[in-house]
C-alpha cells in the first residue's frame, strides 16, 4: 500500500467572493468547501468575502477522501493570520473536519504516515482517533487533535509546549485504549478433530510452508472445522508484517480502535462474493478480500459454489503475491500474498460417489466441478479427501487432557510448524525470508536440490500422473516442507512420495 505526499496552497485576494479548489479533485475533496465554511465560522474565523483559491499539488494525481479537510483549514487560517504560515511548511496534517469543527477519523493514516516519514517533517498532525496508528510508526512527533481549536493551539505553541501536548495526547489515548476490552478470538483446537489424521497432517504441512490446501468431502465431515483450527498453528507475524497488514486494514477502514493487527488475517468471503469484492472495486479501488488476507489465510468454504470468474481472478495473486487493478483513475497494485484454503463437496448434494446417498446425475457432477478450472487446481499444492468419521470416534478420549496430548493438538502442531519455519529461515540467511511455498524456480534449484535417485523417482511419477512443470515445482516445494518438519537437510524419496500423495487431485472424483 503506497501513498504520496500532497501540498496544499491558498491564495486570498480581492475580487468577487468565491471559493475555488483546483488540482484534479474528487467530489469528497470538493465537498470540503461547505464543511470548512461552516466549521471556520464556528470557531470565529469565518471566510472573508474575497476570492479564495486553494491548490492541491501534484495536480496530475487524483485527490480523494476527506483527509484534506484539516490541511485546507490550516492554510486558510494561516492566510487569515490566525497561525504563523512558516509553521506550516514543515507540518504534515490529515483529518476530516466536521461542521462543529471537530476532527474526525480518516482511513489509511498508517500508510500515509509511512510515506510522509520519508520527507522528514518536523511535526505530524492527525485525528485523535487515529493516534494509535501514529504511535506505531517509529518515534515520529505525532499529535492527535480532537478539534480545529486544538490544532491551532498546537501549531501556535512553542517546541517545548508541543512536546508536552503530544505526551498528554498519548497518555489520554493509552488510558482509553486500556479501557477497551479486546475481543478474544477463540481458535478451536485440532485435538477436537477425531479420525482426521491425514487431513491434520496436510494442514500442518500447509502451515509450515505456506502452501495452498484443498479439502474435499461430504457435508459434515469437519472441513470447515479444520479450517477454523488452522490459524492456531500459524507462526506469529513479524513487526514489519504487522505494520504492513495494519496499513491495509487502515486503508480499508477496518482497523479497530487504531490498534495494530496482531494475528494473521483469516478471511472467509461468502460464496456469493463478486469479482470486485474479491479483488477490490470502485472508481478508486478499496482493498478486496485477497488483499485483506495478505500474510494470512483466504478460506473459500463451499469453493465450487463460487462463480468461476471469481475463482479465476485468484490465479494471478496466487503466483505473484499481488493483484493488479486497472481503473479509469489509473492502475493500482495491491499486496495479496495469502495462503489459499478451499473446502468443497464432490457434487451438488455432497455425497458423490456414494450412489446410495448421492442424488446427482453424472452431468451435474461434471458441471459442478467444472467451476474449479484446471489452472486453479494446478496451483493447489495439497489436496486431501475427508471421509465420514465413524460415530464411535466422537465418544473416545473426550477428557480435557486429550486436547493438550502430545502429537495431537494445536500446541504440538504449532511447535512443529515453528521449527520448520526456523529451518527455512536459516536456509535463506543472507537473503529475504521466503517460505517454501513461495520459492521461485531459481530458488528451488538453489534450496531444494535432488539426488539422482530422487530425480528419477520424480520423473517417473510425473510421467504417470501427467504433472506439468508447475506441478513438479509445487511437489518439490511441498517435499522440502515435509523434510523440514522431519528435521532433514535433504529431500528424500519418502518426502517426494508423500508430496505426490497429497498432490492427487482425483480426490474430487473418487
Residue ranges of each PLM-predicted region?
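Peripheral, non-AAA+ core regions of ATP-driven protein-machinery
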Residues: 1-214, 224, 471-472, 490-493, ...
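Basic, amphipathic alpha-helical bundle interface domains used for macromolecular binding and assembly
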Residues: 25-33, 46-48, 55-65, 285, ...
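Short beta-strand elements
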Residues: 4-12, 278, 381-388
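Walker B catalytic acidic pair
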Residues: 295, 301-302, 313
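Conserved alpha-helical scaffold flanking the Walker A/P-loop in AAA+ ATPase domains
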Residues: 204, 259-260, 265, 276-298
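Short hydrophobic alpha-helical runs that function as membrane-insertion/retention elements
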Residues: 122-127, 141-145, 213-216, 236, ...
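Catalytic P-loop NTPase motifs of RecA-like helicase/translocase cores
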Residues: 100, 300-307, 350
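Walker A/P-loop
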Residues: 215-254
Amino acid at each position: 500500500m503506497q501513498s504520496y505526499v500532497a501540498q496544499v496552497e491558498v491564495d486570498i485576494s480581492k475580487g468577487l467572493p468565491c471559493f475555488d479548489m483546483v488540482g484534479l479533485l474528487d467530489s469528497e475533496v470538493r465537498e470540503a468547501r461547505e464543511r470548512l465554511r461552516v466549521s471556520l465560522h464556528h470557531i470565529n474565523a469565518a471566510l472573508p468575502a474575497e476570492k479564495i483559491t486553494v491548490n492541491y499539488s501534484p495536480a496530475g494525481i487524483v485527490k480523494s477522501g476527506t483527509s484534506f479537510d484539516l490541511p485546507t483549514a490550516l492554510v486558510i487560517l494561516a492566510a487569515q493570520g490566525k497561525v504563523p504560515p512558516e509553521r506550516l511548511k514543515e507540518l504534515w496534517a490529515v483529518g476530516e473536519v466536521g461542521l462543529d469543527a471537530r476532527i474526525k477519523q480518516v482511513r489509511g493514516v498508517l500508510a500515509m504516515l509511512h510515506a510522509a516519514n520519508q520527507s522528514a517533517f518536523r511535526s505530524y498532525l492527525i485525528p485523535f482517533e487515529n493516534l494509535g496508528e501514529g504511535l506505531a510508526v517509529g518515534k515520529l512527533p505525532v499529535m492527535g487533535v480532537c478539534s480545529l481549536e486544538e490544532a491551532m493551539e498546537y501549531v501556535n505553541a512553542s517546541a517545548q509546549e508541543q512536546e508536552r501536548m503530544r505526551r498528554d495526547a498519548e497518555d489520554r489515548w493509552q488510558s482509553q485504549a486500556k479501557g477497551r476490552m479486546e475481543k478474544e478470538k477463540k481458535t478451536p483446537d485440532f485435538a477436537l478433530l477425531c479420525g482426521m489424521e491425514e487431513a491434520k497432517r496436510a494442514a500442518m504441512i500447509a502451515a509450515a510452508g505456506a502452501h495452498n490446501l484443498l479439502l474435499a468431502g461430504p457435508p459434515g465431515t469437519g472441513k470447515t472445522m479444520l479450517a477454523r483450527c488452522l490459524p492456531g498453528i500459524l507462526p506469529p507475524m513479524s513487526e514489519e508484517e504487522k505494520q504492513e497488514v495494519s496499513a491495509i486494514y487502515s486503508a480499508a477502514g477496518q482497523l479497530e480502535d487504531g490498534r495494530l493487527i496482531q494475528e494473521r488475517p483469516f478471511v472467509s468471503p461468502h460464496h456469493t462474493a463478486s469479482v470486485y469484492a474479491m479483488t477490490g472495486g470502485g472508481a478508486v479501488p478499496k482493498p478486496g478480500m485477497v488483499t485483506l488476507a495478505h500474510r494470512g489465510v483466504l478460506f473459500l468454504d463451499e469453493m465450487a459454489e463460487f462463480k468461476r470468474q471469481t475463482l479465476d481472478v485468484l490465479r494471478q495473486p496466487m503466483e505473484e503475491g499481488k493483484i493488479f487493478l486497472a481503473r479509469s483513475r489509473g492502475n493500482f497494485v495491491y499486496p495479496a500474498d495469502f495462503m489459499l484454503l478451499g473446502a468443497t463437496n464432490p457434487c451438488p448434494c455432497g455425497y458423490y460417489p456414494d450412489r446410495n446417498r448421492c442424488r446427482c446425475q453424472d452431468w451435474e457432477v461434471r458441471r459442478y466441478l467444472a467451476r474449479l478450472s484446471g489452472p486453479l487446481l494446478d496451483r493447489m499444492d495439497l489436496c486431501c479427501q475427508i471421509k465420514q468419521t465413524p460415530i464411535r470416534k466422537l465418544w473416545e478420549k473426550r477428557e480435557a487432557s486429550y486436547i493438550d496430548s502430545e502429537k495431537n493438538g494445536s500446541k504440538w502442531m504449532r511447535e512443529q510448524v515453528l521449527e520448520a519455519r526456523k529451518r527455512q529461515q536459516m536456509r535463506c540467511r543472507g537473503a529475504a525470508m521466503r517460505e517454501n511455498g513461495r520459492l521461485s524456480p531459481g530458488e528451488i534449484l538453489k534450496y531444494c536440490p535432488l539426488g539422482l535417485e530422487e530425480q528419477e523417482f520424480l520423473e517417473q511419477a510425473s510421467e504417470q500422473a501427467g504433472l506439468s512443470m508447475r506441478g513438479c515445482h509445487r511437489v518439490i516445494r511441498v517435499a522440502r516442507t515435509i523434510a523440514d518438519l522431519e528435521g532433514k537437510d535433504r529431500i528424500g524419496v519418502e518426502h517426494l512420495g508423500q508430496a505426490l500423495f497429497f498432490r492427487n487431485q482425483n480426490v474430487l472424483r473418487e
